[in-house]
Each structure stands twice: as structure tokens, then as C-alpha cells.
């Protein structure tokens, strides 16, 4: 009798508030999705920072020596003879010479002619080649001009502690003894710096052998290993607001810029961890990401605490990233991700009757394209994804859906350190009744501040925010901010009139040598939901330290 009563009570609660918990934003699958989004957001920020460092990279060459005035001696130019060339045509040289033939000229005029020939070399992209005036006795108006077409000599890689020489050298069209085009080398340098975390500077110098040019490639590698410890209060009320994290990142595990990463997350009701590995494919920035994550969540607050609610989820995926345009003003990337996920939720885990409520199996196929545009003082980023989802639920029924996802970010900076930024996220879906890990949630520090994490959810929705940041000290390590956030969700489970959030607030960010802190006071401007009144303010806090 007691077992039957427990089952009846449990079933009743499952059909009311428990159902909302199972399909809400605080179960293991949904939390894991939010964690993956946060990691992707950080990856994009890191990429933008790396792009900023690489935008002005170019091959450096020794400065030419200045010519002294040599206009005192003149003669009539009859003919110019050139040494053999593999780059310049007879017609191109003759066009330059014709301007001076049958004229009284000085050595200054000959030097001007040589400068025009050298400019022609530069226009063709051969900065290692030059024309010069060899020692000679000018007889009957005939001038000899030498054409020194420098060939590639030694290519030296310097300061590459965690990057193989071959990884760098094979990225450039430099062959010993060849006439290499410097413009092409510059293009490859820009591309390399745009698709790698290690940044290069290249300098040309006279080769150790006559007629050759040596290249010194200096590598500026970021810190190879980093251990970060983080804490915040941006967790879920049902599983613990305070969360602790440990992140480990090795940027070049086997010295070929293959990155390994590992993270662990803990709160009072959550244990989560994940790992990943990135393998470069070739030398054009194509990368293959392998990722695995796991999340176990227990309900520690609310009506279901005494009965017990536990959810488990894991996800394994592979992503191919292909940059197809990288230059000083833009970075375009296309990619494809496959992801497999399984999520389970049990009710009554603290009773003698344990019931499986959710048992979902997902296969997702996600093509995407992203664009980053760099202005003089601004950045615009937008990513477009199509998420093709196949879901099998507890009953064995399958359902297919397609989600369109948009992620955008814009920032404008001024010389005084002030910045104005805006972000936008949106999702459209082809069907209702999505699983929690594919729904769109709003609320939280990375969404609409002033509200609990994933406070509202639906099949479709969007968020937008506007933020102004102002430095408070000369070093710009202390910054104040103010913001306005807005979000709205749509779908079959959304209650009309209670489907949007809006907030404003202020914050303070501090950046120290190995530590950063963020304190934000969010003020929800809409506070009445389901007959309950939210607090007038909500504090979001995080601290991050690097070892």
C-alpha cells in the first residue's frame, strides 16, 4: 500500500512541476549544451585576439642604401645592355630604357633607371631581385646594367620551442636555389598567422652565398601549457549556484600545434567533465576537433528534492574546420560537426520506486559558416549553423528536426579605451517538442543578466544586448560597464505574456597579471512570472586564476 501511494504521488508530481524540470534548462543534457556554447564562445574570443596580433605581419627586408648626387658627368645614352634575366621580359626593360635613349644623361639618370627596374621587380613580387650598376668604363654611350636575381638560400626557424621546424617551413613556398616570389611568401605569412596560435615574423638578409637571400623566421609562441581555476555563482538554483572549474590546455602536444584540453566542473548537485583534441590537417589551417563531455546532475532544491531527480548525459563529437579566406580585414571559415548524445533522467531516486522519465538518443549533423570582419577600430563576427537532429526517445519513437542558429557579435573601440559592443543569438526550429538540449534558453550571465541561468526556454527564440565599457585607470586593468539585455522565446510550452526577459545593470571587471574578476549587478525589469515575484537584483560574480 505504501509503495502504491508513493508511486501515485510521484506520478502526480511528474505530470506537473516535475515535467517542467525534466524538459527545463537545468537537466544534464541542457547544462552540457550551455557548457559547450561557453567553450565555443571562448574559442572565438581567443581566435579574434590571435587575429589582431597577426593582421600586420609581412616579410621584412634590409633598407636600401641612399645614393649620393652624381650629376656632374653627362653623356649621350646610345644603348643599354642587361645581364640575363628569368623574370623581366625584353619589352618591359626596353620600355624603361626608351625614356633615356639619345639624351644627355648623368649617373643620377642611370640610378633613376635602375630604381624603375627595381620597382618592376617589386610589382612582380620579387623583392630579392635587383638591378645594379657594375664598375665599368662607359664607351660610345653603351651602359651595362646587371640584374641580380637572388635565389633562396638558407631558411632558418628561430625560437620555435614547441613547434617543429617542418611545420613552419612546409607552410611557405621557399625552395633552396629557387627564385621565390616575395608577394606569395607574404600571403602565406598572413595566412599562417591567421590560422595558427603561434605568430611568425620573417626577415630577409643577404645570403651566405653570393646571389642568394636567406630567410630568418622568428616564432612567437603563446604559453604552451595553462592551468586555470575558476569559480562563479552563475549555476542553477536546482543543482547549485556556486560552481568551481578546472581547465587544462596544452596548445602543442606533439609540437605540431595539436591542442589537448581537459576541464572539470563541480557544484553542489553537478559533476561534469570534458576533454578534447585538435589535429591540424596540412598547412592551410584545416583542423579536426575531437570532443567528449559528460554531465551528472542531481536536484538539490525544490519540490522534488525529497523524492530525488538525477540526470546523466554524455556527448561525443568531431568537427572539421576549414578557413577559406584569411587576410588583414577578414576571416571566413566553413565547417561540419557530427555529435552523438545520450541523456537520461530518473525520478524517485531517493525512494524505493525509481522511474526512468527521459531516455533520449541524439545524432546531430551541423554544417556551419562563420565570418569575421575587421575594421580600423571595429570587429563584426557572425556564425550561421544548420542543426539536423535525429532523436529517439524513451518509447523508441524517432523524430527529425532542423534548427537554424545565428550567433553574432559586434564591437567598436575608441582610443581612450572605451568600447561599445553588442551580441545577438537566435534559433528557429522546424518542429515543436524538442528535447531540452536542443531548445533555446534565455537568462543568465551569458544571456539576459539579472535572471537565473536558463530561466525561460522554448523551441525558438533570440537574445540581444548592448554594453558600454569604460576604463577606470590608466593601465585599463579596471573597467566599468553598463548594459541592456533582452530575450524572447517561442514554442508550444511557452506561456503567453511570460515569454520574454529584459534587464539592465552595471558591472566591474578587473584584470590582473594571473587573475581576472567580474562583478555584475543585474536588474530584471520584468519580475512577475507564474504568480511569483523575482528579486529586484541579481549579482553575477566570477573569478579566474591562471597557474
Where are the regions a protein language model picked out?
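Transmembrane beta-strand segments of outer-membrane beta-barrel domains in Gram-negative
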Residues: 287-431, 490
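Transmembrane beta-strand segments that form the barrel wall of outer-membrane beta-barrel proteins
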Residues: 200, 204, 225-235, 246-252, ...
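C-terminal transmembrane beta-barrel domains of outer membrane proteins
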Residues: 396-547
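Periplasmic polypeptide-binding modules associated with outer-membrane biogenesis and secretion
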Residues: 22-233, 264-272, 424-426
Amino acid at each position: 500500500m505504501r509503495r502504491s501511494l508513493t508511486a501515485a504521488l510521484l506520478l502526480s508530481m511528474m505530470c506537473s512541476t516535475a515535467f517542467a524540470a525534466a524538459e527545463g534548462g537545468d537537466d544534464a543534457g541542457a547544462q552540457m549544451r550551455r557548457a559547450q556554447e561557453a567553450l565555443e564562445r571562448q574559442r572565438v574570443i581567443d581566435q579574434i585576439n590571435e587575429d589582431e596580433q597577426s593582421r600586420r605581419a609581412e616579410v621584412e627586408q634590409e633598407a636600401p642604401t641612399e645614393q649620393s648626387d652624381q650629376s656632374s658627368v653627362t653623356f649621350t645614352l646610345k644603348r643599354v645592355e642587361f645581364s640575363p634575366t628569368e623574370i623581366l621580359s625584353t619589352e618591359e626593360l626596353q620600355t624603361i630604357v626608351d625614356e633615356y635613349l639619345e639624351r644627355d644623361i648623368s649617373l643620377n639618370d642611370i640610378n633613376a633607371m635602375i630604381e624603375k627596374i627595381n620597382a618592376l621587380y617589386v610589382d612582380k613580387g620579387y623583392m630579392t631581385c635587383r638591378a645594379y650598376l657594375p664598375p665599368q668604363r662607359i664607351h660610345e654611350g653603351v651602359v651595362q646594367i646587371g640584374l641580380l636575381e637572388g635565389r633562396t638560400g638558407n631558411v632558418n626557424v628561430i625560437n620555435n620551442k614547441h613547434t617543429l621546424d617542418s611545420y613552419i617551413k612546409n607552410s611557405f613556398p621557399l625552395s633552396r636555389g629557387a627564385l621565390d616570389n616575395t608577394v606569395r611568401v607574404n600571403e602565406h605569412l598572413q595566412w599562417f598567422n591567421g590560422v595558427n596560435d603561434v605568430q611568425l615574423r620573417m626577415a630577409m638578409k643577404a645570403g651566405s652565398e653570393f646571389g642568394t637571400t636567406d630567410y630568418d623566421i622568428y616564432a612567437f609562441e603563446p604559453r604552451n601549457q595553462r592551468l586555470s581555476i575558476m569559480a562563479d555563482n552563475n549555476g542553477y538554483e536546482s543543482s547549485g549556484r556556486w560552481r568551481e572549474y578546472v581547465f587544462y590546455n596544452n596548445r602543442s602536444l606533439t609540437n605540431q600545434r595539436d591542442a589537448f584540453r581537459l576541464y572539470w566542473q563541480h557544484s553542489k548537485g553537478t559533476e561534469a567533465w570534458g576533454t578534447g583534441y585538435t589535429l591540424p590537417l596540412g598547412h592551410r589551417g584545416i583542423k579536426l576537433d575531437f570532443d567528449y563531455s559528460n554531465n551528472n546532475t542531481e536536484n538539490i532544491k525544490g519540490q522534488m528534492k525529497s523524492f530525488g531527480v538525477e540526470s546523466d548525459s554524455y556527448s561525443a563529437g568531431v568537427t572539421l574546420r576549414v578557413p577559406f579566406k584569411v587576410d588583414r580585414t577578414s576571416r571566413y571559415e566553413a565547417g561540419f560537426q557530427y555529435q552523438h548524445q545520450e541523456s537520461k533522467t530518473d525520478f524517485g531516486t531517493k525512494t524505493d520506486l525509481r522511474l526512468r522519465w527521459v531516455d533520449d538518443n541524439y545524432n546531430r549533423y551541423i554544417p556551419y559558416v562563420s565570418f569575421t570582419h575587421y575594421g580600423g577600430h571595429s570587429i563584426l563576427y557572425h556564425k550561421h549553423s544548420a542543426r539536423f537532429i535525429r532523436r529517439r526517445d524513451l518509447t523508441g519513437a524517432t523524430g527529425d528536426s532542423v534548427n537554424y542558429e545565428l550567433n553574432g557579435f559586434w564591437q567598436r573601440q575608441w582610443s581612450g579605451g572605451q568600447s561599445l559592443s553588442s551580441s545577438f543569438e537566435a534559433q528557429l526550429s522546424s518542429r515543436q517538442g524538442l528535447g531540452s538540449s536542443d531548445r533555446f534558453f534565455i537568462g543568465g550571465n551569458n544571456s539576459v543578466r539579472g535572471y537565473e541561468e536558463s530561466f525561460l526556454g522554448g523551441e525558438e527564440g533570440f537574445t540581444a544586448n548592448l554594453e558600454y565599457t569604460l576604463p577606470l585607470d590608466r593601465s585599463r586593468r579596471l573597467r566599468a560597464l553598463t548594459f541592456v539585455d533582452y530575450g524572447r522565446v517561442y514554442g508550444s510550452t511557452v506561456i503567453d505574456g511570460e515569454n520574454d526577459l529584459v534587464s539592465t545593470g552595471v558591472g566591474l571587471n578587473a584584470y590582473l597579471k594571473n587573475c581576472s574578476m567580474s562583478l555584475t549587478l543585474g536588474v530584471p525589469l520584468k519580475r512577475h512570472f507564474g504568480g511569483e515575484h523575482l528579486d529586484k537584483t541579481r549579482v553575477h560574480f566570477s573569478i579566474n586564476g591562471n597557474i
